[in-house]
From Swiss-Prot:
Gene: Gtf2ird2
Residues covered by region (Disordered): 199-222
GTF2I-like repeat locations: 95-189, 319-413
Principal subcellular localisation of the protein: nucleus
Compartment list: Nucleus
Xref: PROSITE patterns: GTF2I
GO molecular function: DNA binding
Domain of life: Eukaryota
Protein name: General transcription factor II-I repeat domain-containing protein 2
Length: 936
């Protein structure tokens, strides 16, 4: 602590002023000795006539009259408090000077604010609504004013009345009978600014218990009277806090603090001070504080009171209080986020645009807020208000009346969690009994999962549901409980796998009673390790790749592997699921696939084919995924020929554009949805169909996004066509197309065509289909298209029964020949992938009937031996393909290798769609991701 030297005094001050400074510096030097151990910053302030003198230390350096902010703040304090023993300055005519009148009015106004605050029952200063109180005198009753004196603004009172009010202010009080709207919006601040622009703080706000002791000045023989002191406590943080202490209980933020935005840490501390959850602050006044001991020290020098303030540096208590406030604020913010998310139609919290809601009233309406609490950001709410909001959480509701300017609500719900970069921390396992399973935090106690790896989400779940029973575990006991819960999680996950896929339980799963159960965190690892072992046994494998956008608007890339081992056992397994962010180019997809294959140490030379969706990113000749995979496989194995199979699992999707029947589907979709989306209309239509004894009791709700159900929808619509036309006409929504003969013919043709396509689709969706079987189905459908083209040319409608039932002309069938031709051409293009390897497929499916000339030269000798072997021919006729190849002797190594390669090929990406269905089920039932590998 630096000592203050006399040489630092200003030389241009008058003698009385220098005497005051000398006295202050002497007092400062003695206080520096006392406060040296506490490392406090000290300042002494005194008022002499119209001047303010400040001396003190800051960062070990002394200053005199250098702190203009302290002078200004102290002067405002003196004006607000008033000097009772100071004689008012008067003008020559005996009237009070304007400064005194302004001082009295401000004092009365502050007292009225205090009374109004007490009447509202809040700790924050609230401006008195003078105009509203004068207009509605019954709303707020003012007690304690003399008879005949009406309540009005202090500016309208005379000086005598102002003095009387200040002398009798103890008996004046307000009683709120009917609160004014809008008064609550000013609650919750640290302070307020009056009409004069003077910052004030509620007088009852304090820094904790205060003890005062007076110290007489021995060198002057006086006991100073009017003073204040600024102290600073230094901690490890270089940014120390500044608190201006005025009197024993009155505080005011200095002008330099109120004029700028506080840092987050300092702002938090100010809130802690306001709520009395702060570290204890002790103020001591050396000496006797009674007024009888206060004497004048020198001529013209006002009495000076020296105050010593000690701030208890209890770091643990301070952090505990701040943590409670932080948690409370997080809980309120999370509540508002969840309610706002519900208002815009999403099932997860959405960041609330507080400023836009505040500055655009009427766009978003918040109902259910507690009485007296106005919606605002949690950082501006009082502690008591936040607690009341949490108590009323069930009643709070957000309603979006109209869009907020500059905010696209349709994009608010598109949350990309994978881009937030959140990482599960190991310490959360012990703190909240959570573990991470397939990148999803899962509670070990109740097995519920949390969508985002955020500590607040985990802590809230634990404190809300489990803390009452599990806080009793600590130290070693908590570690034991954690291990026990992990063992229990494995049992739960094994059960989950049976739910998802009961016919394929976990391999080598131990019974629940086995005491040597593998820890839960190793379950997923053991499954992937077994997959690695299985992949190493493959002699040939293929991959299937597909992508889909999930409910979080994140593109998921699914990679499946189908492999064959030496015993011709076929395995289809989920290799990896990779979220795709950013560009979805062929190069980006290739890098993800290459990384997944590298993770399992897969041999590129054994890769046979890749099945994909046929998009440009997959099939582009220059930078597509298939092109890059072929180059990668060729670099690992000279002469490797990677085959590509485009998805043909949904031929009805291919035909949607080729048939060009949108004018029919649009009418059907609009009509069906209009009937089904209205409960009353739907019920009336059901009754109508029942009365008419129709075949169907209701219609299938349909959207234009999927063709899979169009056959059923169209057939039901066609067979109820007359009833639908009558019903919609009676409801004032006639559809002229329902009476058009040409439109009805198109509808009938579309019914028959979609029925044929759905039959093909059902055949293609079989589980573990061999590529030759899929090829046979497509070739058969192509042959049917050729037959239908020939029949329609002769107006033979034998295979179009619906069209035949409404046909009245011999040329009706001719109109649909172009549609059959386009459909046939599209299927031929899709079959080109299989045409390139048709001879190899034929050798695999019909080894005893294929011609030797169509077989590759390196296989011809073995195929001749095979065709002449009657034992193997008998076995082939008995078991067929593919079981026959399990009995194929090892004396045919090249042919066995060829058959293994054909058997490993995917014919479509249907297995990927099975995965996406399980993923949706997993999100609803809170199952974990590792079970997907078993299910597929």
């Amino acid at each position: 602590m630096a000592q203050v030297a006399v040489t630092t005094q200003p030389t241009d001050e008058p003698s009385d002023g220098r005497m005051v400074v000398t006295f202050l510096m002497s007092a400062l030097e003695s206080m520096c000795k006392e406060l040296a151990k506490s490392k406090a910053e000290v300042a002494c302030i005194a008022v002499y006539e119209t001047d303010v003198y400040v001396v003190g230390t800051e960062r070990g350096c002394a200053f005199v009259n250098a702190r203009q902010d302290l002078q200004k703040d102290f002067a405002q304090h003196c004006q607000g408090e008033g000097l009772p023993e100071e004689k008012p300055l008067c003008l020559g005519n005996g009237e009070a000077c304007p400064g005194e009148a302004q001082l009295l009015r401000r004092a009365v106004q502050d007292h009225f604010c205090l009374c109004y605050r007490k009447a509202l029952g809040t700790t924050a200063m609230v401006p008195v609504p003078y105009e509203q109180m004068l207009q509605d005198e019954a709303a707020v009753v003012v007690r304690g004013l003399p008879e005949g004196l009406a309540f009005q603004h202090p500016d309208n009172y005379s000086l005598a009345t102002l003095k009387w009010i200040l002398e009798n202010k103890a008996g004046i009080s307000f009683a709120v009978k009917r609160p004014f709207l809008g008064a609550e919006s000013q609650l919750g601040g640290l302070g307020m600014v009056t009409d004069a622009g003077r910052p004030t703080v509620p007088p009852n706000d304090s820094y904790g218990p205060v003890s005062v002791k007076t110290e007489p000045m021995e060198d002057s023989g006086t006991s100073p009277r009017a003073a204040a002191m600024l102290i600073k406590t230094e901690s490890e943080d270089p940014n120390y806090n500044v608190c201006n202490v005025q009197g024993s209980q009155h505080f005011s933020a200095s002008s330099d603090v109120t004029g700028m935005e506080l840092p987050s840490e300092e702002s938090t501390r100010m809130v802690a001070l306001e709520t009395n959850e702060d570290p204890e602050t002790e103020v001591k006044m050396e000496g006797n504080a009674s007024p009888s001991n206060l004497v004048n020290s020198a001529a013209g020098v006002e009495d000076l009171r020296i105050i010593q303030v000690t701030v208890a540096d209890n770091e643990k208590e301070r952090l505990s209080g701040l943590e409670k406030i932080k948690q409370l604020r997080e809980q309120v913010n999370d509540l508002f986020s969840r309610k706002f998310g519900e208002a815009i139609g999403v099932d997860f919290p959405v960041k609330v645009p507080y400023r836009k809601i505040t500055f655009n009233p009427g766009c978003v309406v918040i109902d259910g807020m507690p009485p007296g609490v106005v919606f605002k950001a949690p950082g501006y709410l009082e502690i008591s208000s936040m607690r009341r909001i949490l108590d009323a959480a069930d009643f709070i509701k957000f309603t979006v009346i109209r869009p907020l300017p500059g905010l696209e609500l349709s994009n608010v719900g598109k949350r990309k969690i994978d881009q937030e970069g959140r990482v599960f921390q190991e310490k959360w396992e012990r703190a909240y009994f959570f573990v991470e399973v397939q990148n999803i935090p899962t509670c070990l106690i109740c097995k519920q999962s949390v969508s985002v790896s955020k500590e607040y989400n985990l802590r809230r779940h634990y404190q809300t549901n489990h803390s009452r029973h599990y806080d009793q575990y600590s130290g070693q006991a908590r570690e034991e409980k954690l291990r026990e819960l992990k063992r229990g999680l494995r049992k739960y996950l094994l059960g989950a796998s049976e739910i998802v896929c009961p016919e394929q339980p976990f391999p080598n799963a131990s019974p629940p009673t086995n005491s040597a159960v593998q820890p839960a965190e190793e379950v997923a690892g053991s499954l992937w390790e077994k997959l690695r072992q299985k992949i190493r046994s493959f002699v040939a494998y293929s991959i299937a790749i597909d992508e889909i956008t999930d409910i979080n608007d994140t593109t998921q890339l699914a990679i499946f592997i189908r492999g064959v081992d030496d015993n011709f056992d076929v395995s289809e397994e989920l290799l990896d699921t990779v979220p795709m962010t950013g560009a979805k180019s062929g190069n980006e997809i290739f890098l993800r696939v290459e990384k997944s294959l590298k993770k399992f140490s897969i041999d590129w030379s054994k890769l046979v084919s890749v099945a994909s969706t046929g998009t440009p990113a997959m099939m582009d000749a220059n930078s597509g995924l298939v092109t890059k995979l072929r180059a990668r496989a060729a670099s690992c194995c000279k002469g490797a020929d990677l085959k590509s199979v485009r998805c043909i699992i949904h031929p009805e999707w291919l035909c949607a554009q080729k048939l060009r029947m949108g004018h029919v589907m649009d009418v059907v979709v609009d009509s069906v949805n209009w009937i089904c989306s209205r409960g009353l209309n739907h019920g009336d239509f059901t009754t109508l169909l029942y009365e008419l004894d129709s075949q169907y009791g209701s219609l299938l709700y349909h959207t234009a996004l999927k063709w899979l159900g169009r056959g059923l929808v169209l057939r039901r619509f066609f067979e109820s066509l007359e009833e639908i036309d009558s019903f919609m006409s009676s409801r004032g929504k006639p559809v002229p197309q329902l009476s058009s003969r040409d439109w009805i013919l198109d509808l009938a043709f579309l019914v028959d065509m979609t029925t044929h396509l759905n039959t093909l689709d059902a055949s293609l969706q079989g589980h573990s289909q061999i590529v030759t079987q899929m090829y046979d189905f497509i070739r058969a459908f192509l042959a049917k298209l050729c037959l239908w083209e020939t029949h329609l040319a002769r107006n033979n409608l034998a295979h179009f029964p619906t069209l035949k039932s409404v046909s009245r002309s011999e040329s009706d069938g001719l109109n649909y020949i172009p549609k059959i031709v386009e459909l046939k051409a599209e299927f031929q293009r899709r079959l080109s992938d299989f045409k390139s390897c048709e001879s190899e497929l034929t050798l695999f499916s019909s080894p005893f009937s294929t011609t030797i000339d169509s077989v590759r030269e390196e296989l011809q000798m073995e195929v001749i031996d095979l065709q002449c072997n009657t034992v193997l021919r008998t076995k082939y006729d008995k078991v067929g393909v593919p079981d026959f190849y399990k009995h194929l002797w090892s004396s045919y190594p090249k042919y066995r290798s060829h058959c293994a390669r054909m058997l490993s090929m995917f014919s479509s990406t249907h297995i990927c769609e099975q995965l996406f269905s399980i993923l949706k089920l997993s999100k609803k039932e809170a199952q974990w991701g590792a079970a997907l590998q078993v299910a597929t």
